[in-house]
Amino acid sequence: MKIPANGFTHAGKFHADDVFATALLQIIRSDIRITRGFVVPDDFDGIVYDIGFGMFDHHQEPREYRANGIPYAAFGLLWRVLGPGLVGERQARLIDENFIQPLDLNDNTGEQNSLCDAIGFFNPVWDSKEDQDTCFFKAVAVAKQILENQIDSANAVNRADEKVQQAYKNSRDGIVILPCYLPWKNGLYKTDALFVIYPSQRGGWSAQCVTDHKTKKPKLPFPQSWAGQPQEVIEQKSGIEGISFCHASRFLITAKDKETALTACRQVLKNNGRL
């Protein structure tokens, strides 16, 4: 879809929905001119959203609903059309599920959402002399940065997928070893991988459990006796020198080097009858 040079949305109090919808349009077309008003001019030539009962409004009946029952708001309607071109179909769906749907739900039902509250606080208070449109575009600038970060992160996952898949093909016993830190969850989400080992951004190496795509819990967590313990206790309990940390939730350890992390994962496999 080609974005026209002009956009129109409602005036008055603004919400996360129209703010993020505007941010999305600005990301795609930086020179778009946004007008706010209470009535769409008959001769308006551009994209209209969150007002006017058109393709990108959600105040009319019948409304559009997702398969899970969550109604679309203007941001979700725009993202459905424009998102795949920015990040691909899979990542667009994930951003909708994890980021946009809660905003759409808030706009349609008033359900509590902290990000929506934060955007709402940009509205001038009752006795303020601030111009409402100025406040609106301040909120849009913040929303644009947030959304750009989402898009950048999604595309980073897309770039990492090939490397993650290659590491998975080379893996043994359910242990995937990455050459560097990569966003790996997207690539291993529905595989039989059990652990991922990678150089830690804090130094040393990390080993992390792969979660079950249905339960969202680690398929094979690290031992309870390691969880949240100091290094000397973990080393004593495991018999492995160099494991410096095990998260209390048992999904992550850090170790001095790759071999130590690999030894720890193999011990868990052996103790659970997987080797």
Give the role of each language-model region.
Residues 4-46, 50:
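N-terminal ordered "arm"
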Residues 18, 22, 37-39, 63-69, ...:
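C-terminal accessory domains and tails appended to enzymatic cores
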Residues 28-32, 83-91, 215:
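Short helix-capping/linker segments at secondary-structure and domain boundaries
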Residues 32-42, 89-105, 136-137, 157-158:
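Short alpha-helical "patches" and their helix-cap loops
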Residues 40-45, 54-55, 187-189:
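Short loop/helix-cap segments at secondary-structure boundaries that form the rim of catalytic
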Residues 46-127:
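A basic- and aromatic-enriched beta-loop-alpha substructure that forms the phosphate/nucleotide-
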